[in-house]
């Protein structure tokens, strides 16, 4: 099978459960995405622990002044993160500080979001993409449950697009791939499943079929 395009979000506060899931699925997914709940419930060392079994994307949605951004990005980098997610609405210098501090860690900037009420961000994706391009990001975060937005963003870039909004937020992994996503983020549909391994396998198969048809 070709490399997975599935990124599993572990939005948990139970470190032991998160590690259990990570160890069970780490080799069959592209990456595991962690967010503030897991880090705040334990410590930043969770990044390195999960990095032993999978790439780790730190979904910190960094959105502060450049100095603070740099501290957060350096910490994630030093802990072994493969990727970091940052907001772009804070402006060029703030986003550039994340890119510069991240070193080889890939920076994905948020240019559109998946939740209801995100119009303020989503209506300005062109400006956010311009800021992101100038800052030198590796890729973008764009919603997999808002296919028209995702398609328009895909038309404007060849960079890697990672898409949330799949499963519990109504999006389908196959539709997101066909609309232009390179990587698909799925969280609750997997970590709340009675069998996360089987759930991840099913989504991997759905993605693989969509890639073949695309």
UniProtKB/Swiss-Prot annotation:
Query: InterPro entries of this UniProt entry?
Result: Aldolase_TIM (IPR013785), OMPdecase (IPR014732), OMPdecase_arc (IPR047595), OMPdeCOase_dom (IPR001754), RibuloseP-bd_barrel (IPR011060)
Q: Which UniProt keywords apply?
A: Decarboxylase, Lyase, Pyrimidine biosynthesis
Listed Pfam families: OMPdecase
Q: Which residues bind substrate?
A: 11, 33, 59-68, 114, 164-174, 187-188
Q: List the disulfide bonds.
A: none
| One cellular component (GO) term of this entry | cytosol
What chemistry does it catalyse, as a reaction equation? orotidine 5'-phosphate + H(+) = UMP + CO2
Q: Name one GO biological process term.
A: 'de novo' pyrimidine nucleobase biosynthetic process
| One annotated GO molecular function | orotidine-5'-phosphate decarboxylase activity
Q: What is its EC number?
A: 4.1.1.23
Locate the active site. Answer: 61
Q: Which domain of life is it from?
A: Archaea
Pathway annotation: Pyrimidine metabolism; UMP biosynthesis via de novo pathway; UMP from orotate: step 2/2
Instruction: Keyword check for Lyase, yes or no.
Output: yes
Instruction: Give the multimer and partner information.
Output: Homodimer.
* NCBIfam families linked to this entry: PRK13813.1, pyrF
Q: Describe its function.
A: Catalyzes the decarboxylation of orotidine 5'-monophosphate (OMP) to uridine 5'-monophosphate (UMP).
The UniProt entry's sequence similarity note says: Belongs to the OMP decarboxylase family. Type 1 subfamily.
Q: What is this protein called?
A: Orotidine 5'-phosphate decarboxylase
């Amino acid at each position: 099978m070709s490399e997975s395009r599935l990124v599993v979000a572990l939005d948990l506060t139970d470190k032991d459960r998160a590690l259990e899931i990570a160890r069970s699925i780490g080799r069959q997914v592209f990456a595991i995405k962690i967010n503030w709940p897991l880090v705040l419930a334990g410590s930043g060392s969770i990044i390195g622990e999960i990095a032993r079994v999978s790439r780790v994307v730190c979904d910190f949605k960094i959105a502060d002044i450049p100095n603070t951004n740099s501290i957060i990005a350096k910490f994630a980098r030093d802990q072994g993160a493969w990727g970091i997610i940052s907001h772009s609405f804070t402006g060029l210098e703030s986003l550039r500080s994340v890119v510069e501090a991240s070193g080889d860690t890939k920076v994905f900037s948020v240019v559109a979001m998946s939740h209801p009420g995100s119009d303020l961000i989503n209506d300005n994706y062109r400006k956010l993409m311009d800021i992101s391009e100038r800052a030198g990001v590796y890729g973008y975060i764009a919603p997999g449950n808002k296919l028209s937005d995702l398609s328009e963003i895909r038309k404007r870039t060849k960079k890697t697009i990672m898409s949330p909004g799949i499963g519990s937020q109504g999006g389908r992994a196959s539709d997101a791939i066909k609309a232009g996503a390179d990587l698909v983020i799925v969280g609750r549909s997997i970590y709340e499943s009675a069998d996360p391994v089987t759930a991840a396998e099913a989504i991997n198969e759905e993605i693989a079929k969509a890639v073949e048809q695309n």
